[in-house]
Curated annotation (Swiss-Prot):
GO molecular function: hydrolase activity, hydrolyzing O-glycosyl compounds
GO cellular component terms listed in the entry, alphabetical order: extracellular region
Family, similarity comment: Belongs to the glycosyl hydrolase 16 family.
Gene that this sequence comes from: exoK
Residues forming the catalytic site: E138 (nucleophile), E142 (proton donor)
Functional summary from the UniProt entry: Cleaves high molecular weight succinoglycan to yield LMW succinoglycan. Dynamically regulates the molecular weight distribution of succinoglycan by cleaving nascent succinoglycan only during a limited period after its synthesis, perhaps before it undergoes a time-dependent change in its conformation or aggregation state.
Protein name (Swiss-Prot/TrEMBL): Endo-1,3-1,4-beta-glycanase ExoK
The entry's keywords: Exopolysaccharide synthesis, Glycosidase, Hydrolase, Plasmid, Secreted, Signal
Domain of life: Bacteria
Signal peptide start and end residues: 1-29
Locations listed in the record: Secreted
GO biological process, one term: polysaccharide biosynthetic process
UniProt xrefs under Gene3D superfamilies: 2.60.120.200
EC number: 3.2.1.-
Amino acid sequence: MTIDRYRRFARLAFIATLPLAGLATAAAAQEGANGKSFKDDFDTLDTRVWFVSDGWNNGGHQNCTWSKKQVKTVDGILELTFEEKKVKERNFACGEIQTRKRFGYGTYEARIKAADGSGLNSAFFTYIGPADKKPHDEIDFEVLGKNTAKVQINQYVSAKGGNEFLADVPGGANQGFNDYAFVWEKNRIRYYVNGELVHEVTDPAKIPVNAQKIFFSLWGTDTLTDWMGTFSYKEPTKLQVDRVAFTAAGDECQFAESVACQLERAQSE
């Protein structure tokens, strides 16, 4: 993004966590990385793991208010809903969750169906920033409703972005569930869509270094039209998440179809 969306969030500070014994990885050196490998199928919304944004927005560019009422799980699917509903000073309500812990180098994966509608942003990303007394570092997958045939990839390092890359989503990101993953290492980031490598970053100046939280969000704008398209609301729409997983560097992969599993198999051949 071009705006530090999350400067207003209250955050907890955590200590670093070591990976498996005997596996000295760069992740161990990331200050504040206390999150361990996990997989969440969203049978329920575990609020010990997830913080639900509620009662605010991130600035004038956002035309909706985060509301916990827009966040729920249904039949093993996390649903974040955008709809016309006045909440505080906004006429629309939207949903967001974030992990309570921070995560470092490893493989991040989510199976997602994006929302419909120009002017909307369906996002799976990691973020840390000034509210946590850290520089703004961020790694993004964002489906912009104006063109759901693509997913925008991006990184921020100390609030410097401008690294946008558009990757194809065969069949459309809003037509069914697709798998998005990135492998974050000290010296590179690899991005995958449905198990296929679509983008790789190796410039050290473009690779974040600070441990971050995992976010899912669905929000809209009336003003960022060049980027997200002209806002056009027709009916309530949802960002749906079937699964999310994090595999720390050096840990075993979390599920059979995981990109981390694919990379493990490739290394053993």
